[in-house]
Regions:
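Basic nucleic-acid-binding alpha-helical/helix-turn surface characteristic of O6-alkylguanine DNA
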Residues: 1-125, 172-185
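Regulatory, non-catalytic segments
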Residues: 127-138
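Major-groove DNA-recognition helix of helix-turn-helix-type DNA-binding domains
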Residues: 139-143
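Short cysteine clusters
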Residues: 146
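…primarily DNA-binding HTH/wHTH and HhH modules…
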Residues: 152-185
Length: 185
């Protein structure tokens, strides 16, 4: 199996995008603040790819799915229409992870929710930590908006791209959401 790779420049840092023949399967920041954090993310991504896409070869080649991802991100960062339905996603994971990722896509731009609220929405009231783990395993940053999940006290909690980026993304969405002429989503 071949996976196709491209680096996408964004206002908050370069992102590594990987697609399969089915669609986008990974979107990660290439740099993360903190000692060894970048290497940790790369190690985790490689383990995930080995588990869900065996065997695979990574090829540097632009594909229609990568072009659509690049266009989606450009629209998102410009504050114009960016609909997840415009993208084919190939997000492989455990059944509970997939349920959480689907729930994440229902959080409106500029709004946040807690791990506990997602657990309750999934009728798994005691599963806040499991929701957190699934959120952390989200392979498609920004597009599947794990950055919109916060702690039960309203505090910003972990984000694979770093808390500075999480803050930036939430603020970006709130700015565009409050502008009447903009249509972020």
């Amino acid at each position: 199996m071949q996976l196709f790779r491209s680096i996408i420049d964004t206002p908050i840092g370069d992102m590594l995008a990987l697609t399969s023949d089915e669609g986008l399967c990974a979107l990660e920041f290439t740099t993360v603040e903190g000692p060894n954090r970048g290497q940790e993310r790369l190690t985790r991504l490689n383990a995930r790819l080995a588990r869900w896409f065996p065997p695979h070869e990574i090829v540097d080649r632009e594909t229609p799915a990568l072009a659509r991802t690049r266009g989606w991100l450009a629209a998102y960062f410009a504050g114009t229409s960016a609909d997840i339905g415009d993208l084919a996603l190939d997000m492989r994971g455990a059944p509970f992870e997939k349920r959480v990722w689907t729930a994440l896509t229902s959080i409106p731009p500029g709004q946040t929710t807690s791990y506990g609220a997602i657990a309750r929405a999934l009728e798994s009231a005691g599963a806040s930590r499991a929701v957190g783990a699934a959120n952390g395993a989200n392979p498609v940053a920004i597009i599947v908006p794990c950055h919109r999940v916060i702690g039960s006290t309203g505090s910003l909690t972990g984000y694979g791209g770093g808390l500075d980026r999480k803050t930036w993304l939430i603020d970006h969405e709130r700015r565009w959401r409050n502008e009447p002429q903009a249509a972020l989503f």
